[in-house]
Amino acid sequence: MKIYLKFKSYNKRICKLLQLFKLEHDQNCSMGLLINHNSLELYNRENVNQKPIKVDFTSKKNHYRCHHFRRKNEVLYRVSGIKNSYFPTVLDATAGLGNDAFIFSFLGCKVIMIERHPIVAALLKDGLQRGYQDKKIGHWLQTRLHLIVNDSLKMLEIPILQPDVIYLDPMYPFYHKKSLPKKDMQFFRQLIGHNYDSKKLLEVSRKLAKNRIIVKRPYYAKPLSEDKVNHIVTTRNHRFDIYQPF
């Protein structure tokens, strides 16, 4: 895939990632990858004032969320099915920037992220490599959070253990201005586009998961399936629809 490559600093590790995911320089691309001293960032060449995007599992936001964790306040704990010493294996079939996958792993679950877009996969891999080396979280992140680069619709063909839980957070259109995400995330959505195969992805997930499929939706959106939703957990802005496997 072609994208504008800007080298602010030479980094051998990141250069290997560019080669691994076959990312080539395109002078005319409106999106760019910034190679920093120790991180890979996606940025908008048409708006240099817009904050670049990178995967950072050691961010202040993640640190705060983990440090202030309370079972009743963490919705991913409530929907995951964690009980006592039971920590389900989770397959995040719509990894994105890995935010929710990281929280599942922090909670004690072994998590596999699947991402098909090569640029997003490169950002995730960069974030994982840096996270694995972190003194505070690296020791458990290495054993709990991993990435598979593939199409989630082909998950039945991937030689992986059958997960207890499959988590879906598909892209959805926004119908009014108040529901728009931050500008940097709007830019990220331009890169990966909307998921028009979300319903099919749910069907495939229900054939693979052992215990449950969790679908994250905006509060105003219709369920992905016409089948019965077995359980619903709501927050201020989102709804988590839980389905049983076939």
Curated annotation (Swiss-Prot):
The keyword Phosphoprotein belongs to this UniProt entry's keyword annotation: no
Annotated localization: Cytoplasm
Catalytic activity: guanosine(1516) in 16S rRNA + S-adenosyl-L-methionine = N(2)-methylguanosine(1516) in 16S rRNA + S-adenosyl-L-homocysteine + H(+)
InterPro entries: 16SrRNA_methylTrfase_J, SAM-dependent_MTases_sf
Entry's Gene Ontology molecular function annotations: rRNA (guanine-N2-)-methyltransferase activity
Transferase is among the record's keywords: yes
Keywords: Cytoplasm, Methyltransferase, rRNA processing, S-adenosyl-L-methionine, Transferase
EC code(s) of this entry: 2.1.1.242
Binding site for S-adenosyl-L-methionine: E115, R116, D169
GO CC field: cytoplasm
Family the UniProt entry places it in: Belongs to the methyltransferase superfamily. RsmJ family.
HAMAP family the UniProt entry points to: 16SrRNA_methyltr_J (MF_01523)
Function comment: Specifically methylates the guanosine in position 1516 of 16S rRNA.
Designated name of the protein: Ribosomal RNA small subunit methyltransferase J
